[in-house]
């Protein structure tokens, strides 16, 4: 009986286990790629996020920046009301500071684009969270307003990235294989930025889900960039590892039961930053695989809304595929515990990262 309990415990994937898994993997990567900055930058920004979140949490409580819960969500989420929010500040501000420092010592138009791109989505998320708190509703900016702002920023980034040689029609699948997409590359870039930022935002509905998956995906993206072996791209791999550290650091406070939420301030910017880095490093293919959880969450909403509208038009009464979307709510309403859903999604995300890296190496 004791042995069975010990086995059960060892199989559980929680914050501590996830942190050690990523840390050990990065130590291995440091030796494989002969670059100790890999593990160092992860641990430094992990520590920075823990320190500033621990201190900043008190300030957010004092400022009364508290979460509102939508009425249409699961009823058992109402106990999350008044949890401090806008914690994404403690993830994104260190990122922006890192980008400024990097650009100071290693001037690069790509870093400048990444800085202003991430800053722009940060501002959109900040405004959305602030207005939501001010209105005392779980709605800040209207969805059309957010989409227009996201679209304008994304189009500007794509144009500037293309003009500076960061975008071409070839999508790199592996070091030996590329696909020529012709002009389709531009809508691919647009969907990568706007789609992924909103996908992460949709995923951020359970304690620790978006921050945990974010840390895993950034780890995978950083590793993919190092596998490319292109010296000029290494800095983006290190930035991805820094973001992984920041997400894990925030996860310490965001895991169930959450002491703080990242809000749109964090989720929109995390998704956009993933998109920006993948565009600047031509990592679209791998990103699509390793971001599978985010993609599934977004697709579940699209499928639900589309199916409801189609069936309503045909049968005069809309029908649903899922109990509720995004899909993590479907599992909640099916009776699965929140912590178990998050743990399972993390496990799937880890498998997707392994798949993405294996395909990158072997294709």
UniProtKB/Swiss-Prot annotation:
InterPro entries: Glycosyl_transferase_4 (IPR000715), PNAcMuramoyl-5peptid_Trfase (IPR003524), PNAcMuramoyl-5peptid_Trfase_CS (IPR018480). GO terms for biological process: cell division; cell wall organization; peptidoglycan biosynthetic process; regulation of cell shape. Its main location: membrane. GO terms for cellular component: plasma membrane. The keyword Transferase applies. It is a multi-pass membrane protein. Its EC number is 2.7.8.13. Its cofactor is Mg(2+). Coiled coil: none annotated. This is Phospho-N-acetylmuramoyl-pentapeptide-transferase. It comes from Prochlorococcus marinus (strain MIT 9515).
């Amino acid at each position: 009986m004791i042995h069975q309990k010990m086995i059960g415990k060892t199989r559980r994937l929680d914050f501590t286990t996830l942190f050690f898994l990523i840390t050990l993997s990065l130590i291995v990567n440091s030796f494989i790629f002969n670059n100790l900055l890999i593990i160092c930058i992860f641990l430094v920004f992990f520590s920075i996020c823990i320190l500033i979140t621990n201190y900043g949490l008190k300030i957010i409580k004092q400022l009364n920046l508290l979460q509102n819960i939508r009425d249409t969500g699961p009823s058992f989420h109402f106990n999350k009301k008044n949890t401090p929010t806008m914690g994404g500040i403690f993830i994104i501000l260190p990122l922006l500071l890192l980008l400024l420092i990097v650009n100071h010592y290693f001037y690069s138009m790509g870093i400048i684009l990444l800085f202003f791109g991430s800053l722009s989505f940060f501002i959109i998320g900040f405004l959305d969270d602030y207005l939501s708190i001010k209105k005392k509703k779980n709605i800040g900016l209207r969805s059309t307003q957010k989409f227009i702002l996201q679209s304008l920023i994304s189009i500007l980034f794509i144009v500037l990235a293309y003009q500076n040689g960061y975008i071409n029609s070839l999508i790199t699948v592996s070091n030996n294989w590329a696909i020529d997409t012709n002009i389709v590359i531009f809508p691919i870039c647009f969907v990568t930025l706007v789609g992924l930022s909103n996908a992460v935002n949709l995923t951020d509905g359970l304690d620790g889900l978006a921050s945990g998956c974010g840390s895993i995906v950034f780890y995978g993206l950083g590793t993919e960039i190092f596998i490319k072996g292109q010296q000029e791209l290494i800095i983006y791999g290190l930035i991805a590892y820094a973001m992984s550290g920041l997400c894990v650091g925030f996860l310490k406070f965001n895991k169930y039961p959450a002491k703080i939420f990242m809000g749109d301030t964090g989720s929109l910017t995390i998704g956009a930053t993933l998109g920006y880095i993948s565009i600047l490093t031509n990592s679209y293919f791998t990103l699509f695989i390793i971001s599978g959880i985010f993609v599934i969450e977004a697709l579940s909403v699209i499928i639900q809304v589309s199916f409801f509208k189609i069936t309503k038009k045909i049968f005069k009464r809309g029908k649903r595929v899922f109990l509720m979307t995004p899909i993590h709510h479907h599992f909640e309403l099916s009776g699965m515990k929140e912590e178990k859903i998050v743990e399972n999604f993390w496990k799937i995300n880890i498998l997707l990262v392994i798949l993405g890296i294996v395909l990158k190496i072997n294709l």
